[in-house]
């Protein structure tokens, strides 16, 4: 709004819009919205998407109407909320300068942003709520508003969000109950909040310990072909107190089957590994290293391939504290295993649709 006001009053923003990454943030927001309509809600992001009238300014500034592909659909929904609805009159100003009859879909299906919080996105299409969607996150708990969610992922297929993030908990509900929310030290109370902890995210937990706050998990490789779509995240610093190395690869194969591969190397101590995925589906353990997920008439087979003994598990999402938000209609699924000392090991999980 400031830039729009400066341009209107003075004919220039004196270079503010050229700040590194600023114009790209519009495309970032677009990719963060999944086909099903919810956000890739890592860190302190809410789950629900909103119509953002600033996207119309970005579209005009960038001369790229494809930025409005999702927003145009929102305008057809009377139930859709607006972000900062007090600024809604600005929508008419921005739209008056655009030809809204010629909004085309985005041309790309991949997004990869580096920086302190690297994120990879694959969007199988832009036309259907049943399009496949994969989001992968690296980063650090030490960044602004972060959770212990390095290595986490979101996965949608056939209209179901099979792997989800519970999203943020509003600050007032925690601070009003005396939670020291902004103490981000390793032993800070922030990490006792269920939704902020690593045990409530689609990532690994080793020896029951928290992720290291002063760690950083870079996305070291991306895959952007028809045969493989996804990213590799180096989680070694996240677990530096427990193991020598952890590298996670999250990909979709040619059939859009999800594969999550974790390669670990232990030191002179064994490592008890918990593999966790949060889901809205119902789950049933159907055999050794196998589990079936069911949601909205769809079924998904979860299999584990490991060189150690695996115990398949489901966990309730009933949180441990009175101040935690409830999480109805969700559970955690996965497995536990122990990797011996001085061992290189691989854990591979596949999600395969069942007809």
State where each predicted segment sits.
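Carbohydrate-active enzyme catalytic cores, enriched for enzymes
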Residues: 1-163, 224-228, 232-234, 330, ...
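Cytochrome P450 core scaffold surrounding the K-helix E-X-X-R motif
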Residues: 163-166, 171-175
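CBM-like, beta-strand-rich accessory domains located in the C-terminal region of large
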Residues: 45, 73-81, 85, 173-355
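Catalytic-core segments of enzymes that bind and process phosphorylated/nucleotide-bearing substrates
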Residues: 156-158, 167-169, 290
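Active-site donor-binding loop signature of nucleotide-sugar glycosyltransferases
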Residues: 138, 166, 206
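Short, acidic Gly/Pro/Ser/Thr-rich loop/turn segments
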Residues: 129, 143, 171, 211-213
């Amino acid at each position: 709004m400031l830039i729009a006001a400066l341009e209107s009053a003075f004919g220039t923003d004196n270079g503010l819009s050229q700040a590194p990454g600023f114009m790209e943030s519009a495309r970032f927001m677009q990719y963060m919205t999944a086909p099903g309509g919810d956000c890739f809600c890592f860190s302190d992001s809410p789950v629900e998407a909103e119509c953002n009238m600033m996207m119309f300014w970005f579209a005009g500034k960038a001369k790229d109407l494809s930025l409005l592909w999702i927003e145009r659909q929102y305008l057809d929904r009377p139930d859709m909320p607006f972000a900062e609805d007090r600024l809604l009159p600005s929508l008419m100003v921005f739209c008056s300068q655009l030809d809204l009859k010629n909004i085309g879909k985005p041309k790309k299906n991949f997004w990869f942003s580096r920086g302190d919080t690297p994120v990879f996105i694959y969007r199988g299409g832009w036309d259907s709520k049943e399009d496949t969607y994969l989001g992968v996150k690296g980063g650090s708990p030490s960044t602004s508003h972060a959770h212990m969610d390095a290595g986490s992922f979101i996965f949608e297929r056939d209209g179901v969000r099979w792997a989800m993030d519970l999203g943020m908990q509003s600050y007032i509900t925690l601070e009003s109950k005396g939670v020291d929310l902004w103490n981000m030290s390793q032993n800070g109370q922030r990490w006792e909040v269920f939704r902020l902890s690593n045990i409530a995210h689609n990532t690994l937990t080793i020896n029951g310990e928290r992720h290291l706050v002063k760690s950083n998990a870079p996305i070291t490789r991306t895959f952007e072909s028809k045969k493989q779509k996804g990213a590799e995240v180096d989680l070694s610093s996240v677990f530096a107190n427990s193991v020598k190395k952890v590298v996670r690869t999250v990909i979709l194969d040619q059939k859009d089957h999800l594969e999550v591969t974790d390669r670990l190397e232990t030191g002179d101590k064994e490592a008890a590994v918990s593999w966790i995925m949060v889901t809205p589906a119902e789950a049933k353990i159907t055999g050794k290293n196998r589990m079936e997920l069911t949601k909205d008439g769809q079924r998904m087979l979860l299999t584990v391939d490991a060189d150690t003994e695996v115990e398949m598990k489901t966990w309730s999402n009933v949180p441990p504290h009175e101040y935690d938000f409830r999480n109805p209609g969700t559970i955690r699924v996965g497995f536990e295993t122990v990797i011996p000392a001085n061992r290189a090991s691989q854990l591979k999980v596949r999600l395969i649709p069942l007809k």
